[in-house]
């Protein structure tokens, strides 16, 4: 499978790459340079670049969005919400049926996430609260 990974140099990137690299063709993208030990295809790309994400996803079978930004309101919105829009737009434009978007599990259940003890299910109502990261990821999920 040909996979586009958005935001791939962050915390989850190395684990996802390790799990996929031997069986799939990966294009890693991020605004930061890849780790020195990464020997695959890399493109410098911001997840909120709608045209850039659409172009990078051409010919791909799957898009995985690992992007995250927490420290600035506008940038968090651009990355988590507009970035998700860019990903979904690219999937629709290029007829990509497999899309994975990562985000905090507590955007589903708010600050009471400890009470669920990891038992997340589709019937859980979203409760992102007012925390910047959870709220911006929740808005992205709504797209």
Indicate residue ranges for each PLM-predicted region.
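N-terminal Rossmann NAD(P)H-binding glycine-rich loop of SDR-like oxidoreductase domains
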Residues: 3-23
